[in-house]
Amino acid sequence: MNGSKFGKSINGLLVLFLFLVFIIPVVTIFFFDLRFYYIPENEISKFYIYSLIYSTLGILAAIIIARMFRKEERSKIPNTIRLILGILWIVDGILQFQPEMPYGFLSVVIEPSIQAINNVGVEKFLMIGYNIWLLHPFQFDALSGSLQIFIGVAYLLNRSTKALNYISFISIIWALVIWIFGEGLGGIPESGVSLLTGFPGSALIYIILAVPYISPKLGNIKNLQKYFTYTVSAIFLIGGILQIIPGNTFWTKGQLAYDIYMNINQQGENPIVYAILNHTYVYLLFRENYLNIFMFLLMIASGLFILLHIRTGLILATVFVGLTWLLFQDMGIYILPATDPNTGLPLLLMLVILIEIDFQISSKRIIKGAAQGVSVT
């Protein structure tokens, strides 16, 4: 299988995987929201009218941009990145339209993040965004979701270098706003921050994925490989260091099991996910003595192996991130009110991108070597 066919296969499988991962949870979430979360009919009607108008304008803008730049030179960045960003942004936008979001986003998502920060200056800064949102919660929530829909659709419809450059600037700016105000700087100022539970924040991963579209140097496949290799390695190595800091309490018996326990009783939890979490919680509760050192070694080994271009590191990291996304992050979208799939899925997809790039470079080397062999003989 050549690089082109492999890339198309990856893209097809990714779209199918993301569709299956998201469609059932999103339907489940909205079903339970509309059933259990009360909001006055006149207010919910107003909210969805705003959302419909803004989303329609956003989609039209994305279509116009696609038509404007359809004859421009196509981007050399692997198509997988564009598809991943597009789907993730659209899902995030849809989740922002949940009935409880105008007010629940502040009380359930933002307030706990602000309260967990042990820095008065950072706390006051984040309260600025909190108070602005509170002035017009329905309009701001509708605008927020619609902007994310626009970014996602624009990524899916556009393939030209110029268009993706402009879209990525918007994507990076908005992701930065989300990372600061919505994710509390990815939890970095909080005690107990960990790669297991969401460090460094999904929005920061979105920024990392969008950077290649605004950096001409990363149009070269080898430079792109270095960029993702260094970035992914840094995330795992820093995650390993955070895991062994005594102040983060992961050495405390029962802490890791407690992190899973907090996800078990989520309203609207999928029965299959519930069963997996419950069994894991019971298992860890009595066998946690050496688990934290194992987590630390796994993160450090993954980071170093990836940095040294040892493919075992990519396999270790992929399995690790997949399991932690399910067990410790509850797939993000099940932690109500869900606003995104948490850090696990974007990081997992970034590893898939690195695997694809690594395969493309290896294929080119094989083809080049074969061509040189033929010419010599």
Would you name each region that the model predicts?
Residues 2-150, 154-377:
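Extended, low-polarity transmembrane helix blocks
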